[in-house]
Amino acid sequence: VYKRQAKERMVALVKNLQESLGERVKGLAWMGDSTKVKALEKLATFHVKIGYPDKWKDYSTLEIKDDSYWANMERTNEWNHAEMVAKAGKPVDKEEWLMTPQTVNAYYNPTTNEICFPAGILQYPFFDMNADDAFNYGAIGVVIGHEMTHGFDDQGRQYDKDGNLKDWWTDEDSKRFDERAQVMVNVFDSIEVAPGVHGNCRMTLGENI
């Protein structure tokens, strides 16, 4: 059962891990000062979503009938499509969630620079209100750190703090990042996942980072 106190505790966990990641960024010997400033700005402006949205999506115009599952799916898909098309030309709603609260997952969205942790994942074994911080840092803390890092992986680093597709790295720092990423690519590509079949780290680099 999701409790309000879970959000309060998650807010504290996220804040502490933001600060910790910030210290790691400051200590990077290979990253220049100008890129560090931009990275820290992006980290500090993460839009954090926890539990469930403050504004629920209005489904009042969606018709669910007892005719057939297929027909209900058709109507639902049509409704979703119409809702998406209606957003064209309008300001981006940064309060909109891309996952339902009951989803056991989390995400980082580079176009809004947000990290989201639905109520569904705030339960054992990822999170336990009755456990001490050590347990939760070792469980949900891994998920929090994972999503934060997506903001600076091979894909996320291409977006700025406002979610714009904009290069905020110096050429030298970008080159150094690619050199370090290539080391990881080489390691994962050398893994034989099945007889005669090797991994393709370029396809999974963001997750591997």
List PLM regions with ranges:
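Intrinsically disordered, low-complexity linker/terminal regions across diverse proteins
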Residues: 4-209
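Active-site loops and adjacent core secondary-structure elements that bind or stabilize anionic groups
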Residues: 1
